[in-house]
Protein backbone atom coordinates (compact mmCIF):
# COMPACT_ATOMS: atom_id res chain seq x y z
CA UNK A 1 0.00 0.00 0.00
CA UNK A 2 1.23 3.48 -0.87
CA UNK A 3 1.96 5.26 2.43
CA UNK A 4 1.66 8.63 0.66
CA UNK A 5 -1.88 8.09 -0.64
CA UNK A 6 -3.30 10.50 1.95
CA UNK A 7 -0.81 13.29 1.22
CA UNK A 8 -0.80 16.28 -1.10
CA UNK A 9 2.40 16.03 -3.19
CA UNK A 10 3.89 19.51 -3.55
CA UNK A 11 6.91 20.50 -5.63
CA UNK A 12 9.58 22.78 -4.20
CA UNK A 13 8.52 25.62 -6.53
CA UNK A 14 4.84 25.31 -5.62
CA UNK A 15 5.63 25.10 -1.90
CA UNK A 16 7.71 28.27 -2.02
CA UNK A 17 4.84 30.07 -3.73
CA UNK A 18 2.45 29.37 -0.86
CA UNK A 19 4.18 31.78 1.52
CA UNK A 20 7.18 34.09 1.16
CA UNK A 21 7.79 37.45 2.82
CA UNK A 22 11.20 38.29 1.36
CA UNK A 23 12.88 38.41 4.77
CA UNK A 24 15.82 36.17 5.67
CA UNK A 25 15.18 34.97 9.26
CA UNK A 26 18.89 34.29 9.85
CA UNK A 27 22.32 35.04 8.43
CA UNK A 28 24.76 32.83 6.50
CA UNK A 29 27.02 32.67 9.57
CA UNK A 30 24.13 31.52 11.77
CA UNK A 31 23.20 28.90 9.20
CA UNK A 32 26.78 27.55 9.10
CA UNK A 33 26.67 27.25 12.88
CA UNK A 34 23.47 25.20 12.71
CA UNK A 35 24.56 22.65 10.09
CA UNK A 36 25.41 19.12 11.15
CA UNK A 37 28.64 17.45 10.02
CA UNK A 38 28.65 17.19 6.22
CA UNK A 39 25.07 18.48 5.86
CA UNK A 40 24.35 20.98 3.10
CA UNK A 41 21.82 23.77 3.37
CA UNK A 42 21.61 27.34 2.06
CA UNK A 43 19.69 30.54 2.77
CA UNK A 44 17.75 29.71 -0.40
CA UNK A 45 16.56 26.50 1.30
CA UNK A 46 15.57 28.53 4.35
CA UNK A 47 13.50 30.92 2.23
CA UNK A 48 11.94 28.35 -0.09
CA UNK A 49 11.31 25.48 2.35
CA UNK A 50 11.55 26.50 5.99
CA UNK A 51 9.83 29.90 5.94
CA UNK A 52 6.63 28.40 4.43
CA UNK A 53 6.97 25.45 6.84
CA UNK A 54 7.16 27.84 9.79
CA UNK A 55 4.01 29.56 8.55
CA UNK A 56 2.21 26.20 8.32
CA UNK A 57 3.33 25.30 11.85
CA UNK A 58 1.93 28.63 13.04
CA UNK A 59 -1.47 27.69 11.55
CA UNK A 60 -1.39 24.43 13.51
CA UNK A 61 -0.40 26.34 16.66
CA UNK A 62 -3.36 28.71 16.33
CA UNK A 63 -5.75 25.78 15.91
CA UNK A 64 -4.16 24.08 18.92
CA UNK A 65 -4.61 27.19 21.07
CA UNK A 66 -8.20 27.63 19.86
CA UNK A 67 -9.07 24.03 20.76
CA UNK A 68 -7.55 24.48 24.23
CA UNK A 69 -9.71 27.59 24.76
CA UNK A 70 -12.80 25.68 23.61
CA UNK A 71 -12.06 22.89 26.09
CA UNK A 72 -11.92 25.47 28.87
CA UNK A 73 -15.28 26.91 27.82
CA UNK A 74 -16.78 23.42 27.79
CA UNK A 75 -15.40 22.63 31.26
CA UNK A 76 -16.32 26.08 32.63
CA UNK A 77 -12.79 26.54 33.91
CA UNK A 78 -9.51 28.05 32.82
CA UNK A 79 -7.33 25.61 30.88
CA UNK A 80 -3.76 26.76 30.26
CA UNK A 81 -2.30 26.16 26.82
CA UNK A 82 0.21 23.29 27.09
CA UNK A 83 3.49 23.33 25.17
CA UNK A 84 3.19 22.75 21.42
CA UNK A 85 5.40 19.74 20.65
CA UNK A 86 6.93 19.11 17.22
CA UNK A 87 8.35 15.66 16.43
CA UNK A 88 11.04 15.18 13.79
CA UNK A 89 11.80 11.65 12.56
CA UNK A 90 13.94 10.02 9.87
CA UNK A 91 17.00 7.85 9.34
CA UNK A 92 20.47 8.24 10.76
CA UNK A 93 22.45 10.75 8.63
CA UNK A 94 19.40 12.08 6.74
CA UNK A 95 19.69 15.56 8.26
CA UNK A 96 17.15 15.50 11.12
CA UNK A 97 19.41 17.41 13.49
CA UNK A 98 19.97 20.25 11.04
CA UNK A 99 16.22 20.48 10.38
CA UNK A 100 15.51 20.52 14.13
CA UNK A 101 18.10 23.20 14.98
CA UNK A 102 17.08 25.32 12.00
CA UNK A 103 13.40 25.17 12.94
CA UNK A 104 14.25 26.06 16.54
CA UNK A 105 16.19 29.12 15.41
CA UNK A 106 13.54 30.30 12.92
CA UNK A 107 10.62 29.74 15.32
CA UNK A 108 12.43 31.60 18.12
CA UNK A 109 13.25 34.43 15.71
CA UNK A 110 9.70 34.57 14.32
CA UNK A 111 7.88 34.29 17.66
CA UNK A 112 10.14 36.35 19.88
CA UNK A 113 7.98 35.99 22.98
CA UNK A 114 7.86 32.20 22.75
CA UNK A 115 10.29 29.93 24.56
CA UNK A 116 11.45 27.40 21.94
CA UNK A 117 13.55 24.45 23.13
CA UNK A 118 14.95 21.32 21.52
CA UNK A 119 15.83 17.82 22.71
CA UNK A 120 17.01 14.69 20.97
CA UNK A 121 15.76 11.22 21.89
CA UNK A 122 19.38 9.96 21.80
CA UNK A 123 19.55 10.98 25.45
CA UNK A 124 16.92 8.35 26.22
CA UNK A 125 19.03 5.49 24.90
CA UNK A 126 20.03 3.07 27.63
CA UNK A 127 23.67 3.70 28.65
CA UNK A 128 26.21 1.42 26.93
CA UNK A 129 26.78 -0.41 30.22
CA UNK A 130 23.09 -1.40 30.36
CA UNK A 131 23.03 -2.38 26.67
CA UNK A 132 26.08 -4.60 27.25
CA UNK A 133 24.52 -6.18 30.35
CA UNK A 134 21.37 -6.96 28.37
CA UNK A 135 23.38 -8.32 25.43
CA UNK A 136 21.90 -5.84 22.95
CA UNK A 137 24.84 -3.52 22.28
CA UNK A 138 24.68 -4.56 18.62
CA UNK A 139 21.03 -3.43 18.60
CA UNK A 140 21.83 0.13 19.65
CA UNK A 141 19.41 2.44 17.85
CA UNK A 142 16.72 -0.23 17.52
CA UNK A 143 13.48 0.27 19.52
CA UNK A 144 14.52 -1.98 22.41
CA UNK A 145 17.65 0.12 23.08
CA UNK A 146 15.57 3.13 24.20
CA UNK A 147 14.06 3.72 27.63
CA UNK A 148 10.65 4.54 26.18
CA UNK A 149 8.93 4.72 29.56
CA UNK A 150 11.40 7.40 30.65
CA UNK A 151 10.84 9.35 27.41
CA UNK A 152 7.06 9.15 27.72
CA UNK A 153 7.17 10.28 31.36
CA UNK A 154 9.41 13.19 30.30
CA UNK A 155 6.97 14.30 27.59
CA UNK A 156 4.04 13.98 29.99
CA UNK A 157 5.81 16.29 32.45
CA UNK A 158 6.43 18.78 29.63
CA UNK A 159 2.77 18.76 28.59
CA UNK A 160 1.70 19.05 32.24
CA UNK A 161 3.63 22.31 32.59
CA UNK A 162 6.19 21.21 35.16
CA UNK A 163 8.54 24.10 35.98
CA UNK A 164 11.86 22.41 35.30
CA UNK A 165 12.58 19.02 33.75
CA UNK A 166 15.92 17.30 33.21
CA UNK A 167 16.55 15.82 29.76
CA UNK A 168 19.48 13.36 29.64
CA UNK A 169 22.33 14.25 27.28
CA UNK A 170 23.97 11.95 24.71
CA UNK A 171 27.44 12.55 23.28
CA UNK A 172 28.21 11.26 19.78
CA UNK A 173 31.94 11.75 20.36
CA UNK A 174 31.80 9.50 23.45
CA UNK A 175 29.08 7.31 21.88
CA UNK A 176 27.17 7.15 25.16
CA UNK A 177 24.73 8.92 27.46
CA UNK A 178 26.71 11.29 29.72
CA UNK A 179 26.09 10.28 33.32
CA UNK A 180 24.99 13.17 35.52
CA UNK A 181 24.70 15.64 32.63
CA UNK A 182 21.31 17.11 31.73
CA UNK A 183 19.68 19.78 29.65
CA UNK A 184 17.08 21.79 31.56
CA UNK A 185 13.69 22.13 29.90
CA UNK A 186 11.91 25.09 31.49
CA UNK A 187 8.25 25.47 30.53
CA UNK A 188 8.72 25.81 26.77
CA UNK A 189 5.96 27.22 24.60
CA UNK A 190 7.31 25.07 21.78
CA UNK A 191 9.40 21.92 22.21
CA UNK A 192 11.07 20.18 19.26
CA UNK A 193 11.76 16.47 19.78
CA UNK A 194 14.18 14.98 17.24
CA UNK A 195 15.05 11.30 16.85
CA UNK A 196 14.75 8.20 14.70
CA UNK A 197 12.11 6.69 16.97
CA UNK A 198 9.71 9.60 17.47
CA UNK A 199 6.87 8.17 15.34
CA UNK A 200 7.26 4.49 16.26
CA UNK A 201 4.54 2.41 17.90
CA UNK A 202 6.27 -0.11 20.20
CA UNK A 203 4.17 -3.24 20.71
CA UNK A 204 4.56 -3.16 24.51
CA UNK A 205 3.39 0.46 24.92
CA UNK A 206 -0.16 1.69 25.48
CA UNK A 207 0.89 5.34 25.25
CA UNK A 208 3.14 6.36 22.36
CA UNK A 209 5.67 9.17 22.04
CA UNK A 210 3.73 10.54 19.07
CA UNK A 211 0.61 10.90 21.25
CA UNK A 212 2.27 14.01 22.67
CA UNK A 213 3.00 15.59 19.28
CA UNK A 214 0.96 18.43 17.83
CA UNK A 215 2.90 18.47 14.56
CA UNK A 216 5.30 15.95 13.06
CA UNK A 217 7.90 15.94 10.29
CA UNK A 218 9.59 13.01 8.54
CA UNK A 219 12.86 13.74 6.72
CA UNK A 220 13.03 11.30 3.81
CA UNK A 221 15.51 10.22 1.12
CA UNK A 222 16.45 7.18 -0.92
CA UNK A 223 18.32 4.67 1.32
CA UNK A 224 21.25 4.55 -1.14
CA UNK A 225 21.67 8.31 -0.76
CA UNK A 226 21.43 8.10 3.02
CA UNK A 227 24.16 5.45 3.04
CA UNK A 228 26.36 7.79 0.99
CA UNK A 229 25.73 10.64 3.46
CA UNK A 230 26.38 8.30 6.40
CA UNK A 231 29.78 7.30 5.01
CA UNK A 232 30.65 10.91 4.15
CA UNK A 233 29.78 11.95 7.70
CA UNK A 234 31.85 9.07 9.08
CA UNK A 235 34.84 10.28 7.06
CA UNK A 236 34.37 13.84 8.32
CA UNK A 237 34.29 12.56 11.92
CA UNK A 238 37.54 10.65 11.37
CA UNK A 239 39.19 13.84 10.11
CA UNK A 240 38.84 15.43 13.56
CA UNK A 241 38.76 12.41 15.90
CA UNK A 242 42.50 11.59 15.56
CA UNK A 243 43.27 14.67 17.68
CA UNK A 244 41.31 13.39 20.69
CA UNK A 245 42.13 9.98 22.27
CA UNK A 246 38.87 10.19 24.27
CA UNK A 247 36.78 10.40 21.11
CA UNK A 248 34.93 7.18 20.24
CA UNK A 249 36.12 7.48 16.62
CA UNK A 250 39.79 7.90 17.60
CA UNK A 251 40.38 4.13 17.39
CA UNK A 252 39.26 4.20 13.75
CA UNK A 253 40.93 7.50 12.89
CA UNK A 254 44.44 6.30 13.79
CA UNK A 255 44.15 3.02 11.91
CA UNK A 256 43.89 2.15 8.25
CA UNK A 257 41.27 4.24 6.48
CA UNK A 258 40.01 1.29 4.41
CA UNK A 259 39.51 -0.81 7.56
CA UNK A 260 37.56 2.00 9.20
CA UNK A 261 35.27 2.37 6.20
CA UNK A 262 34.80 -1.40 5.97
CA UNK A 263 33.57 -1.28 9.57
CA UNK A 264 31.25 1.67 8.79
CA UNK A 265 29.78 -0.10 5.74
CA UNK A 266 29.14 -3.16 7.87
CA UNK A 267 27.37 -1.05 10.52
CA UNK A 268 25.19 0.45 7.80
CA UNK A 269 24.37 -2.98 6.35
CA UNK A 270 23.72 -4.80 9.64
CA UNK A 271 22.31 -2.01 11.86
CA UNK A 272 21.27 1.24 10.19
CA UNK A 273 19.68 -0.14 7.01
CA UNK A 274 17.64 -2.88 8.77
CA UNK A 275 16.54 -0.33 11.38
CA UNK A 276 15.49 2.05 8.60
CA UNK A 277 13.58 -0.59 6.64
CA UNK A 278 11.93 -2.37 9.58
CA UNK A 279 11.22 0.39 12.08
CA UNK A 280 11.75 3.90 10.69
CA UNK A 281 10.32 3.90 7.14
CA UNK A 282 7.05 2.25 8.29
CA UNK A 283 6.41 5.36 10.44
CA UNK A 284 6.72 7.80 7.52
CA UNK A 285 2.98 7.70 6.80
CA UNK A 286 2.22 8.98 10.32
CA UNK A 287 3.91 12.37 9.80
CA UNK A 288 2.04 15.61 9.07
CA UNK A 289 4.79 16.68 6.66
CA UNK A 290 7.32 14.63 4.69
CA UNK A 291 10.39 16.51 3.45
CA UNK A 292 11.90 14.48 0.60
CA UNK A 293 15.58 15.00 -0.18
CA UNK A 294 17.60 14.25 -3.28
CA UNK A 295 21.32 14.72 -4.10
CA UNK A 296 23.25 17.18 -1.90
CA UNK A 297 20.44 17.20 0.69
CA UNK A 298 18.26 19.25 -1.66
CA UNK A 299 14.56 19.11 -0.70
CA UNK A 300 12.75 18.59 -4.00
CA UNK A 301 9.32 17.43 -2.84
CA UNK A 302 7.06 18.10 0.15
CA UNK A 303 4.12 15.94 1.18
CA UNK A 304 1.37 17.48 3.32
CA UNK A 305 -0.98 15.09 5.09
CA UNK A 306 -4.60 15.47 3.94
CA UNK A 307 -6.33 13.93 6.95
From Swiss-Prot:
Metabolic or biological pathway: Cofactor biosynthesis; coenzyme A biosynthesis; CoA from (R)-pantothenate: step 1/5
GO CC annotation: cytoplasm
UniProt keyword terms in alphabetical order: ATP-binding, Coenzyme A biosynthesis, Cytoplasm, Kinase, Nucleotide-binding, Transferase
Keyword Cytoplasm appears in the UniProt entry: yes
Alphabetized GO MF terms: ATP binding; pantothenate kinase activity
UniProt-annotated location(s): Cytoplasm
Documented EC number(s): 2.7.1.33
Binding site for ATP: 90-97
InterPro entries the record matches: P-loop_NTPase (IPR027417), PanK (IPR004566), PRK/URK (IPR006083)
PANTHER family: URIDINE KINASE
Intrachain disulfide bonds: none
Pfam families: PRK
Protein name: Pantothenate kinase
Protein's UniProt keywords contain Kinase: yes
Annotated GO biological process: coenzyme A biosynthetic process
Catalytic activities: (R)-pantothenate + ATP = (R)-4'-phosphopantothenate + ADP + H(+)
Main location: cytoplasm
Database matches in HAMAP family: Pantothen_kinase_1
Family classification: Belongs to the prokaryotic pantothenate kinase family.
Highest taxon of source: Bacteria
Protein species of origin: Enterococcus faecalis (strain ATCC 700802 / V583)
Amino acid sequence: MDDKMNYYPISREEWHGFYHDGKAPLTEAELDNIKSVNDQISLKDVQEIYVPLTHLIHLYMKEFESLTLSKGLFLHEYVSVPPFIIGIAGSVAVGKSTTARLLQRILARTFKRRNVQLITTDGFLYPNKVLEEQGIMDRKGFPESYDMEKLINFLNEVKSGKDEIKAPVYSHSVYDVIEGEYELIQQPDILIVEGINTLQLPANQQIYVSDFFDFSIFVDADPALIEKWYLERFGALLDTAFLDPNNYYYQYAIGKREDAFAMARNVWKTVNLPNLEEYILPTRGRADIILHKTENHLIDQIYLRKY
